[in-house]
Amino acid sequence: MNKTTLLYTGKAKQVYATDDPDVLWMAYTNQATALNGEKKAQIAHKGELNRAISTLLFKELTAVGIPTHYLDSPDSTTMIVKKAAMLPLEVVVRNYASGHFVTKFNVKPMMKLDPPIHEYYYKSDELGDPFMNEAQIFALHEATPEQLKQVRALTDRINTYLMQRFAAIGITLVDFKLEYGTLKDGTLVLADELSPDNFRLVDQQTGASLDKDVFRQNRGPLTPVYEEVLSRLQEKGAAHV
């Protein structure tokens, strides 16, 4: 498998075409961004750590029947994935109140949200990723009712698995972001990445952040935090879920 044309440069990844028209080459970079890209820095080993965490979790979710775009990880910063037409939506799941949800609704931080909340955001840096409700999604033809039904069902299954997975290693999954796409045969798959860049994680013993909030809020070096998450996931495998 060889990469060819650079198709897209994102905040933390570069995506290339390959000599297989149905397969993409995803390169994880060391760039960290926050505040809609206003804050940027190069973080040592971040690409390797996010690739490793994403690979581990994609493999586990695939093993429990979640359709994903994952195919292979040939080196420390590369992921080979199925080519998917991405839905222009960020799916946010909130298990506990945190971030702007706290200020928006004037609730206590870490209040448990039962049932978990699904939110949808239109994926557009230019527009600041605005919130979308289901009526807006359908009216603008960003996803079909059947696709969104599948998204909700898959997201609930993924959330249940990940909450248990992280709880088993002493981490609370506060909230997280997912992205989905469709393969050329129409199959809806989980795509993008699964890492502390997209998860809000809190240590159950200390209350410390174990995610990109450390960078966003200038709480210290980010690399050791991501190393800790990976180490715990590797130490206790999926059998503990």
UniProtKB/Swiss-Prot annotation:
GO terms for molecular function: ATP binding; phosphoribosylaminoimidazolesuccinocarboxamide synthase activity. This is Phosphoribosylaminoimidazole-succinocarboxamide synthase. One of its GO terms (biological process) is 'de novo' IMP biosynthetic process. PANTHER family: MULTIFUNCTIONAL PROTEIN ADE2, SI:DKEY-6E2.2. Its EC number is 6.3.2.6. Keywords: ATP-binding, Ligase, Nucleotide-binding, Purine biosynthesis. It is an enzyme of class 6 (ligase). NCBIfam families: purC (TIGR00081). It catalyses: 5-amino-1-(5-phospho-D-ribosyl)imidazole-4-carboxylate + L-aspartate + ATP = (2S)-2-[5-amino-1-(5-phospho-beta-D-ribosyl)imidazole-4-carboxamido]succinate + ADP + phosphate + 2 H(+). It comes from Lacticaseibacillus casei (strain BL23) (Lactobacillus casei). Pathway: Purine metabolism; IMP biosynthesis via de novo pathway; 5-amino-1-(5-phospho-D-ribosyl)imidazole-4-carboxamide from 5-amino-1-(5-phospho-D-ribosyl)imidazole-4-carboxylate: step 1/2. InterPro entries: SAICAR_synt/ADE2_N, SAICAR_synt_PurC, SAICAR_synth, SAICAR_synthetase. It holds the Pfam family SAICAR_synt. Belongs to the SAICAR synthetase family.
